[in-house]
């Protein structure tokens, strides 16, 4: 693909393909540090990060070890987290310190989270005292808290300042963030009392007091709030940024919409992977790491599959006498499993977005029950017609129809009951639900189909 980026007021056309990766690989092999450095300087940081991600492990190591090659902090922060962890192993302590000193605090925290404790302390001790204090304080909070994603760099001014004082302060202060959409107004105790959009400051006369143009209805986020909860607040209230406060309600940081986009993306990816039982697996993870991560859920799935086989074993003699039962069994189980997974996916989504509540839970149960009946009847009719044409057996058609309706109803009900029950037990429903739902639909499907078959034929 061809990427066109605007960098420092000039457009850079960057052809990203296998051929270019081959060129970079060859230049690394030939120790051509000049070509590599110049090429990376011309690229957008995201494109340079893509190049590093597409290199194999040996080439990445050789790239970092090239003479005079210094990885740009803006490039490093764009690199995939699992690749970051690998690249960090090849970087010197001075290089890591240089990267951390040139990034905003929230990006620095993400990097430090991927460094083991011993090296982390060594790196922190090499940072300026102010930076070290800020990062240590953020790291003291839980991993998924607002403190871990907030920026310590923010713009806050007293309420009694004029617009002119504020503009002069913004021009002269070098410690402010490079970009900001809102200015936080604080009282004498440094507690946030309002916000003013930066655009409004530019349009207001210099003599006007900031407290006269501030918006008092601003959102304050507790420093220990779960980051997923923060994401919901940003979604619900269409926030561009929000201040973060400590237990004394004093301003300690801010969270911006780009931080939340990353959080929501990561949470969505985690939910999809957990639903499949692979956790937070990355494409760059090694074979052993991936195998270990998948083993637990595959083992659990094996035991649940054995349960379904035990149910089938109870009807072994019936199956031997009516072979058609064995032929049609997978249809009922498969339809129930798919229907259950559909309901499960919707339920996990509504749990994650707080749409499913105690007030509408009963309503959703009735809705899924109704959907199960309707889909059950529709597919019962279709299945009955197919079986009648296939085996010319009315009894067999009736058996599959009844079991289809039963299993579709069960699938709908347990597709919502299982994740909600797990959530109430403080178990992540995205991780464990799929195994239980598929097991229930398989067992009920086989039990109903073979049980009804045994009743009618014997």
Language-model region placement:
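Active-site His/Glu-centered metal-binding helix of metallohydrolases
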Residues: 443-444
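Alpha-helical transmembrane segments and their membrane-interface boundaries
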Residues: 263, 268-405, 409-413, 417-431, ...
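Hydrophobic packing positions in regular secondary-structure scaffolds
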Residues: 2-276
């Amino acid at each position: 693909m061809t990427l066109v980026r605007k960098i420092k007021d000039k457009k850079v056309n960057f052809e990203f393909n296998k051929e270019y990766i081959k060129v970079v690989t060859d230049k690394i092999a030939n120790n051509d540090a000049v070509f590599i450095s110049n090429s990376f300087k011309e690229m957008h940081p995201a494109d340079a990060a893509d190049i590093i991600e597409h290199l194999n492990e040996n080439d990445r190591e050789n790239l970092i070890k090239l003479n005079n090659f210094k990885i740009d902090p803006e490039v490093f922060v764009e690199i995939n987290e699992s690749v970051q962890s690998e690249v960090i192993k090849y970087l010197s302590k001075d290089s890591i310190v240089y990267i951390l000193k040139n990034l905003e605090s929230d990006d620095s925290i993400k990097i430090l989270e991927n460094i083991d404790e011993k090296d982390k302390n060594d790196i922190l001790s090499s940072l300026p005292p102010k930076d070290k204090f800020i990062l240590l304080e953020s790291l003291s909070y839980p991993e998924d808290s607002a403190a871990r994603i907030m920026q310590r760099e923010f713009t806050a001014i007293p309420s009694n300042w004029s617009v002119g004082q504020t503009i002069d302060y913004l021009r002269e202060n070098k410690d402010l963030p490079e970009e900001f959409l809102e200015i936080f107004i604080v009282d004498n105790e440094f507690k946030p009392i309002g916000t003013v959009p930066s655009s409004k400051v530019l349009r207001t006369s210099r003599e006007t007091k900031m407290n006269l143009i501030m918006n008092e209805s601003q959102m304050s986020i507790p420093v220990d709030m779960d980051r997923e909860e923060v994401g919901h607040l940003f979604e619900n209230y269409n926030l561009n940024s929000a201040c973060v406060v400590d237990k004394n309600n004093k301003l300690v940081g801010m969270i911006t919409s780009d931080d939340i986009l990353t959080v929501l993306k990561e949470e969505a990816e985690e939910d999809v992977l957990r639903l499949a039982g692979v956790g937070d697996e990355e494409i760059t993870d090694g074979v052993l790491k991936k195998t270990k991560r998948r083993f637990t859920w595959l083992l659990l799935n094996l035991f649940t599959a054995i349960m379904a086989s035990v149910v089938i074993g109870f009807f072994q003699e019936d199956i031997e006498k009516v072979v058609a039962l064995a032929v049609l069994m997978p249809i009922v189980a498969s339809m129930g499993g798919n229907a259950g997974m559909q309901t499960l996916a919707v339920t996990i989504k509504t749990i994650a977005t707080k749409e499913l509540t105690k007030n509408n839970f009963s309503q959703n149960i009735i809705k899924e029950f109704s959907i199960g009946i309707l889909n059950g009847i529709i597919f019962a009719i279709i299945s009955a017609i197919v079986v009648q044409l296939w085996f010319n057996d009315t009894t067999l058609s009736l058996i599959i129809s009844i079991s289809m309706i039963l299993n579709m109803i069960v699938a709908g009900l347990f597709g919502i009951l299982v994740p909600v029950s797990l959530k109430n037990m403080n178990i992540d429903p995205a991780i464990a639900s799929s195994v239980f739902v598929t097991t229930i639909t398989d067992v009920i499907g086989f039990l109903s189909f073979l049980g009804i078959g045994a009743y009618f034929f014997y």
